[in-house]
Amino acid sequence: RGLINSPFIVINGDDFYGLDTYQVIYDYYKNGGNDFSMVAFQLGKTLSEFGSVKRGLCTVKNKQLQTVVETGDLEKSLTGIKSDRDIQLNGSEPVSMNVWGFTPKIFTYLNSMFNDFLTSNVEEPTSEFLIPTVVNSLISSNEEKVRVLNTESSWFGVTYKKDKDYVRKRLKRL
């Protein structure tokens, strides 16, 4: 805080997002975008062949993020994609893989919300302060809008040990 005075990106350090992902978020801010942003991936391009995963399933309206709902036990099945929720999924649904674009204004929100989080969770040492929770709160209170940017890139990362060979092969092809 105090050192960043322009839009910036927040990502998971152990995931690969593809060049297009960075290009779309860069272009958004270069071309005058002012809202917070998130790059959405297609659910089907983020699943593991070796087990179920958890993803932030997004509701989007007019390119604006409405909600991000953590959805677990996602995996391919004969009838589509199953999950821990009673919903129909076909793989084209937008999901958050934690590629966020923020302006420095986020630091004010994070400071306040993190202090509240610590106070509320003092007895819960395993609780986590999650960016999607912050974003959902800002959207539901109408304090911020989050522009959803789409990418054709395939996400990949090592969720399971068996994913390691696949990721190695993909990285060698770059």
Question: In which residue ranges do the predicted regions lie?
Answer:
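Short, conserved alpha-helix that lines the donor NDP-sugar binding/gating region
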Residues: 1
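Conserved core of the sugar-phosphate nucleotidyltransferase
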Residues: 18-100, 104
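The conserved acidic donor/metal-binding loop of glycosyltransferases
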Residues: 13-16
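Short aromatic/hydrophobic "clamp" motif used to bind/position activated sugar donors
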Residues: 8-9
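Conserved alpha/beta core of the MobA/IspD/sugar-nucleotide pyrophosphorylase nucleotidyltransferase superfamily
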Residues: 61, 68, 75-174
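Short, high-confidence coil segments that cap the C-terminus of an alpha-helix
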Residues: 5, 33-34, 143-144
